[in-house]
Amino acid sequence: MPTFKIKPKTGLLIRDPETFELLSESGEDKPKISYWLNHLKNGDVELVTETTTKAKNSNKEQA
């Protein structure tokens, strides 16, 4: 099953429907199923890309 890495939008708490655990703020690989795709469509979660991760890390190094 295809997966994608997603994280909750700032200030939102999103639970995994299978584990009931909160989605990690740093992002997690999740299957591309309707539950996660609907959250993405509604703007509750966002895709995590390598450039997003690298940009945040470089900002932390500058601080």
Curated annotation (Swiss-Prot):
Recorded hits in Pfam families, A to Z, give: DUF2635
InterPro entries linked to this entry: DUF2635 (IPR024400)
* Family stated for the protein in its record: To phage Mu protein gp38.
Record protein name field: Mu-like prophage FluMu protein gp38
Species, as recorded: Haemophilus influenzae (strain ATCC 51907 / DSM 11121 / KW20 / Rd)
